[in-house]
């Protein structure tokens, strides 16, 4: 059996992207691509190359909160940029959002992983992203 995952693009506009991710674990753990930049709408013919995390709201209910949800910039070696546990909201809009580190082999995509989980652990994560286009 596998984790039950719902990953939805709520809004894909010229400048903003809103995603909704929900998982109920069966104890197997999972990694899900929550942003696939190659599938995003373009803006005046320009292709989205990456995104910045502008705001995130989440409710994470896990047995091992020390190793809860990890958000990662996809690269040759993924870069963890946010760890989520409990119920909170973060707003990074005052400085333009959390920027992709563009590590070696970066794709612009964003992964979310539930590394240490027990049967019934769950999480809901809603993100507002700023789209960054090729020059």
Enumerate the language-model features and the residues they cover.
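Extended, low-complexity, turn-rich repeat/linker tracts enriched in Gly/Pro/Ser/Thr and Asp/Glu
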Residues: 58-68, 117-120
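Short amphipathic beta-strand/extended segments with alternating polar/hydrophobic composition
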Residues: 33-37, 80-86, 126-128
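C-terminal interaction-tip segments
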Residues: 3-15, 115-135
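N-terminal low-complexity, intrinsically disordered "leader/linker" segments enriched in small/polar
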Residues: 1-59
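Hydrophobic beta-strand residues in large extracellular and virion-surface proteins
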Residues: 53, 58, 69-71, 110-112, ...
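Noncatalytic modules at the cell exterior or secretory-pathway interfaces
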Residues: 96-122
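An anionic, turn-rich surface loop/hairpin at beta-sheet edges
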Residues: 78-99
């Amino acid at each position: 059996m596998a984790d039950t995952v719902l990953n939805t693009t709520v809004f894909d506009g010229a400048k903003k992207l809103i995603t909704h991710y929900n998982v109920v674990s069966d104890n197997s753990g999972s990694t899900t691509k929550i942003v696939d930049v190659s599938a995003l709408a373009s803006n005046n013919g320009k292709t989205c190359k990456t995104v910045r995390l502008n705001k995130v709201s989440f409710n994470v209910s896990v047995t091992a909160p020390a190793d809860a949800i990890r958000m990662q910039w996809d690269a040759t070696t993924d870069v963890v940029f946010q760890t989520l546990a409990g119920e909170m909201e973060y707003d990074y809009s005052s400085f333009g959002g959390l920027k992709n580190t563009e590590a070696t082999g970066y794709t612009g995509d964003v992964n979310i992983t539930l590394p240490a989980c027990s049967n019934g652990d769950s999480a809901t994560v809603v993100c507002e992203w700023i789209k960054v286009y090729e020059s």
